[in-house]
UniProtKB/Swiss-Prot annotation:
Organism: Shewanella sp. (strain ANA-3)
GO molecular function: S-adenosylmethionine-dependent methyltransferase activity
Subunit relationships: Monomer.
Location of this chain's protein in the cell: Cytoplasm
Stated role: Catalyzes the 2'-O-methylation at nucleotide C2498 in 23S rRNA.
Name of the protein described by the UniProt record: Ribosomal RNA large subunit methyltransferase M
Taxonomic path: Bacteria, Pseudomonadati, Pseudomonadota, Gammaproteobacteria, Alteromonadales
Protein residues bound to S-adenosyl-L-methionine: S187, C220, P221, G222, G223, D239, D259, D276
HAMAP family: 23SrRNA_methyltr_M (MF_01551)
Length: 361
């Protein structure tokens, strides 16, 4: 297929477009971007007929900051007849064979979500016809490709596929997390989503486990500390402001009424460092770099608040500088990931894992 369809947050189409333009060029897949403000999606139109196939295979979704989900896509199917929308879609998917799942989706906008009820109903007959054509297996198979049909408006859809090992497990790339009734703030969901994004399920018992020591810089009132406590960690919560009383009653939290930028940990066996401070992103990055150079943590999750303009450029500059500084200070083995999470707004979440090949005692 010729195109790559990418879901993103409404208002971040320019950032998603700039990123896919750069990343596709790195893979020598030429093309141009189609994007409109607040559509919540971007289409990268490749010059080569199989450009979308190449990108969906070679470009890891997890390496993209602003895309929630992506799939190799056909040209836009416009003016689908009300009397038979199924046949043109089945025909457009003729080159897809034995897919394991069907997702009929919309972009994440209020206008597009008005089609949600239609999409749910339409899935049933479409699934039956795709099974008859051989594009879809009779039984769901999580190891096979996923068929995507994304309605961007009434009678208008992009169709295509993604690979299950390079795709979000969620419809539209949106995780459905529930806000706990006793969580101190909604920001709690950001760290919950970040753990799911950056730490594979099969590794969470080792890397996100009870008994670990953690530090939360800028902790007040305790939204991120809550997620650490919920996972059984012992937390040093650093903030001049007050902490949630119920969190303090757990006995797992020690509150340091200090400036997060000046705090130095008493413990030297800290595994997790987390930080969600409203501060210039470069300053937060410098703080994390200092902690890494001092060897004060193994893994960190932190948020970078985004400027109003040149957001992709700013994030990339900070991440590139961080990589250079770590290497200059003898930290040559690390994993650095960044994602504009669903629960993020004008910010991105970054994960830094120092020397992942070395065990933590």
């Amino acid at each position: 297929m010729k195109n790559l369809f990418l879901f993103c947050r409404a208002g971040y189409e320019k950032e998603c477009a700039a990123e896919i333009q750069q990343r596709a060029a790195e893979l020598n897949v030429g093309g141009f971007v189609k994007a409109n403000n607040n559509d919540a999606y971007v289409v990268y139109q490749c010059f080569e007929e199989d450009g979308g196939d190449t990108l969906v295979k070679q470009l890891p979704l997890d390496s993209l900051i602003f895309a929630r989900q992506m799939f190799a896509a056909s040209e836009l199917l416009a003016d689908l007849p009300e009397s038979d929308r199924v046949s043109p879609i089945v025909a457009a998917l003729s080159e897809v064979s034995k897919a394991g799942e069907l997702r009929v989706e919309t972009p994440d906008t209020n206008e597009a979500k008005e089609l949600s009820a239609f999409c749910r109903k339409f899935t049933v007959p479409l699934r039956q016809h795709l099974k008859k054509s051989g594009s879809l297996l009779a039984q769901e198979n999580p190891k096979r490709p996923i068929i995507h049909v994304c309605f961007i408006g009434p009678g208008r859809a992009y169709v295509g596929y993604s690979f299950s090992n390079n795709s979000s497990p969620y419809f539209m790339g949106i995780p459905r997390l529930k806000m706990a009734a006793d969580a101190p703030s909604r920001s709690s969901l950001k760290l919950d989503e970040a753990f799911a994004q950056f730490v594979p399920k099969e590794e969470q018992e080792v890397r996100v486990r009870s008994g670990m020591n953690a530090v939360d810089l800028g902790a007040c009132p305790g939204g991120w500390t809550y997620q650490l406590v919920r996972r059984g960690m012992m937390v040093s919560a650093v903030d001049n402001g007050p902490m949630n009383e119920k969190l303090m009653e757990t006995g797992q939290v020690k509150h340091f009424r200090e400036d997060g930028f000046r705090f130095e940990p008493q413990r030297k066996n800290i595994y997790w460092l987390v930080c969600d401070m409203v501060e210039k992103p470069a300053r937060v990055a410098e703080l994390i770099e200092a902690w890494a150079i001092n060897g004060w943590f193994k893994e960190a999750i932190f948020n970078l608040k985004l400027p109003m303009k040149s957001r992709y450029k700013e994030v990339m500059a900070i991440l590139n500088t961080m990589q250079e500084i770590l290497k200059e200070n003898g930290i040559n083995e690390f994993q650095l990931q960044c994602k504009h999470l669903y629960h993020d707004r004008d910010e991105v979440t970054v994960h830094l894992w120092i020397r992942p090949s070395q065990a933590w005692n």
